[in-house]
Amino acid sequence: MNFTNTSKLLAAALCLATSYSYADSERPLFSLTMTESGVQQTNNDGSLAGATKSESRILPIWGDAARAKGYDLPEPFGASYSYMNLRQDIVVDSIKFEFTNPIFKPWEKQTIVNAGKTREKSETHMLKLDSWVLPFLNVYGVYGKTKGTSKTNLDTVYAPGAYEPWKNLPFELNFKGKTFGGGITLAGGYNQFFATLDTNYTRTNLDILDGDISALVITPRVGYEFVFEPLLAGQGNTKVQVWVGAMYQDITQRFKGNVSNLDLPPELALFDMIKKQTDIKFDVEQHLAHKWNNTLGARIEVTRNFNILSEVGFGNRNSFFISGEFRF
């Protein structure tokens, strides 16, 4: 049995096993509602209009008082479906291994992996339920599924008994999991200008890791609302909101798991021989290459009960987000 090659391959596999970072969240898992509460409603010429017809509701609290002052409040409850595509760079700081069989314990210090560039791509499908508790405060919960791919080029891999390190080893890792969490959105405006601040926290269970991945995402936005003639008769003015913003992500930086859960490439065929003699755990520390990126988005309120939203991220992180929402 060639332990040298096997050790190299194991190191390569484990390095990429933890190159995943969610928030990619997602969400990730981000502010899906941009209906601006606290923005005075206007006609299509920009003049202040009377309150849109809306019966008195339990929520939002103080909603009747806000409507009496001429503010246009969205329907209090919402349900939406969204899709997000995210691409970002990951920096792997360290990779360690643990062998349960005492015979292989010396390998823990002798196996050294230096990871190069790591690029992650992920797709997330998300369901969201929300409510405007106050005219300026939205509270929501999210649940969804994520799948993706992480690609890494391992600069060098040092293995026990090896005469030379293994260099420039490409590796691709596929992952999938479920995400759940919640958040709040603060919103306000002046005339047709508005601002929102969304904060959410999520946890993701991946099939290749032990435990959860936690993610904190904060997204400030500022924008302007355009008002047009109704697209559908009797449904009120059609509104189009455009905005610019930024997204901050803080993701769990340490991941652990079992090598046996990884979908290893054909080059790691010798791994099966090791797997029969010992369990091998990986422990990886990493961080996002960039925590902030820019965003640009738009939302079309087709009727008071249905809207479509889309947002793109650019700069240090690339993302595309789209959702459809029903309000009632």
Positions of the model-derived regions?
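Transmembrane beta-strands of outer-membrane beta-barrel pores
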Residues: 83-89, 143-149, 188-192, 199-205, ...
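Outer-membrane beta-barrel translocator domains and adjoining extracellular loop/strand segments
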Residues: 91-98, 151-158, 206-212, 254-261, ...
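Cleavable N-terminal export/targeting peptides
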Residues: 1-57
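Transmembrane beta-strands of outer-membrane beta-barrel proteins
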Residues: 75-82, 139-141, 193-197, 218-220, ...
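Residues on the lipid-exposed face of transmembrane beta-strands in outer-membrane beta-barrel proteins
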Residues: 70, 81, 127-135, 141, ...
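Short loop/turn motifs that connect adjacent beta-strands in outer-membrane beta-barrel proteins
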Residues: 24-26, 67-75, 131-136, 189-195, ...
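Outer membrane beta-barrel transmembrane domains
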Residues: 241-328
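Residues that define the transmembrane beta-barrel architecture of outer-membrane proteins
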Residues: 75, 121-125, 174-180, 212-218, ...
